[in-house]
Amino acid sequence: MEQEKSLDPQLWHACAGSMVQIPSLNSTVFYFAQGHTEHAHAPPDFHAPRVPPLILCRVVSVKFLADAETDEVFAKITLLPLPGNDLDLENDAVLGLTPPSSDGNGNGKEKPASFAKTLTQSDANNGGGFSVPRYCAETIFPRLDYSAEPPVQTVIAKDIHGETWKFRHIYRGTPRRHLLTTGWSTFVNQKKLIAGDSIVFLRSESGDLCVGIRRAKRGGLGSNAGSDNPYPGFSGFLRDDESTTTTSKLMMMKRNGNNDGNAAATGRVRVEAVAEAVARAACGQAFEVVYYPRASTPEFCVKAADVRSAMRIRWCSGMRFKMAFETEDSSRISWFMGTVSAVQVADPIRWPNSPWRLLQVAWDEPDLLQNVKRVSPWLVELVSNMPTIHLSPFSPRKKIRIPQPFEFPFHGTKFPIFSPGFANNGGGESMCYLSNDNNNAPAGIQGARQAQQLFGSPSPSLLSDLNLSSYTGNNKLHSPAMFLSSFNPRHHHYQARDSENSNNISCSLTMGNPAMVQDKKKSVGSVKTHQFVLFGQPILTEQQVMNRKRFLEEEAEAEEEKGLVARGLTWNYSLQGLETGHCKVFMESEDVGRTLDLSVIGSYQELYRKLAEMFHIEERSDLLTHVVYRDANGVIKRIGDEPFSDFMKATKRLTIKMDIGGDNVRKTWITGIRTGENGIDASTKTGPLSIFA
């Protein structure tokens, strides 16, 4: 028998796909017999005592091979079982293993330049040519002499078996494009390529041009013929009991000797070979496995570090994750988001303690991933370890209180707790489920929800304290008292004390609402009598003028009494971030103020000049004698009672009363206290300038 020759690992990986991971020589892996049986697409009958769900092994040898007829790539891996299958094994140094080698897998080396293209109907036609993408022609192919007319060259490429192929590469057409002409039809016919297959070009480290093939599904397991699903390879994630129809079809093809395409790859994994490998692994003897990466089944020899890392996470329903999928032609990798819907053993009869396909998932895009119902924990990347907790409505009158430790389990969820040595417990149950009645949500959780609404969303540091990813030796959750360390007692005290006065605060905020004050003006001060209009201007009767005058005087007096209550709470928070010497200037009818730097103003005269320029307001010579302001205590003072430097430090808000009856609120006078000469009945119709410090 001719000895098998290992192929170029770089071209092998380019044909297998970028997401395929073959373990390195001397590395440690967990061998999953359950996954190996899925790869054979038939549950073998071992006729032996229960096999451990995972077996720790060392990689003795790796051979990269390809089928002589179809160029389908596969690998033969020799594994040696190691003592101790515990997941708490931290590193390989305990076993005296050497660091993983990077010779066979290309690990640790820079990936060579490669390009893959799915063949179109024109590319696969007999007698036609191959349209080369520009990127491939300029980066993978040898440099083309564009000065020649036409630019043409002969390209020599090696396939997966080392056989050379010659193609004529020409740059022509309108618009111009790169084409492979002579020699391409021969390659298509001998390789039996069809539209949908992919061609891979790779530039090796030695500079040689290599060509590989990725065949599209032609029926059998994992085939989605006639489907619009752009990710047909996802069907390979189906379990045996979820694809009985396809399995029967595959077995019929095997019996009929039909080994075309991918069916050939999967058909070569004999059930007897799987049973023999599992039996030898269970006895601690070296064994060999064959893996076809294009068979669309998960890898069953997984890096030990990846499995340990995944099983340190305390998985439970509601966790958010993302998972990478490669398209059937391996042209791109897409990430899909999902939620863990349940954590349950996939096959509790044959593999009761196996983490293989432990997670039952629900996808955000179920149409694309309708066949992927279960995944293994090491295939997903956790996005949020905080499960979704559905709470019943709570009463807003309840005061917040700190939840007690026994009140904070995850209600209505079940998740297993694996012990570090769960793989050794052949027949015993080594996982426990925590379950609670979802109908009786404790008040502590309701209070926590209320606190989140009052104080905002939890900070990242708080969420990090709610760590669900650590295991303890006795298979118990950490005490939920860890939630107490994340709860700020000062916030709790603040809410417990101030909730008694919540009604008063609510009233104060309502009184300071500008919209409600404006509505009050409209409802009280509006006159329902008929108005006369001359040239678009309303003409008020004497009674209307008196009513409005009386209303506005009463409104002004009320404003002075409750000014701080009405405005203080509404604008105080917006002014807290102002630096010393800065204040906000508001027109009466505007909610958005302008920031004014008082530190650059040296006197009150300059202040009014600045305000006049800012709001385009006329300035009067007697302005200073009529201006008053309020200090922080609400005491009315006149300008000059304190130096301008002290006034500048204390002032945070300036409010300019507008012309109530004028047409243009911008064209108003800045005056002092209303008098009979320049009040609301005067021709200027202006109000006072109030300065709130």
Curated annotation (Swiss-Prot):
GO terms for biological process: abscisic acid-activated signaling pathway; auxin-activated signaling pathway; cell division; developmental growth; fruit development; leaf development; pattern specification process; petal development. Homodimers and heterodimers. One of its GO terms (molecular function) is DNA binding. The keyword Protein biosynthesis does not apply. Keywords: Auxin signaling pathway, DNA-binding, Nucleus, Transcription, Transcription regulation. GO terms for cellular component: nucleus. Interactions between auxin response factors (ARFs) and Aux/IAA proteins occur through their C-terminal dimerization domains III and IV. Auxin response factors (ARFs) are transcriptional factors that bind specifically to the DNA sequence 5'-TGTCTC-3' found in the auxin-responsive promoter elements (AuxREs). Could act as transcriptional activator or repressor. Formation of heterodimers with Aux/IAA proteins may alter their ability to modulate early auxin response genes expression. The keyword Signal does not apply. Belongs to the ARF family. InterPro entries: ARF_dom, ARF_plant, B3_DNA-bd, DNA-bd_pseudobarrel_sf, PB1-like. SUPFAM superfamilies: DNA-binding pseudobarrel domain. It is found in: Nucleus. Residues 115-217 bind DNA. Residues 580-668 form the PB1 domain. This is Auxin response factor 10. The lineage of its organism: Eukaryota, Viridiplantae, Streptophyta, Embryophyta, Tracheophyta. Expressed in the whole plant.
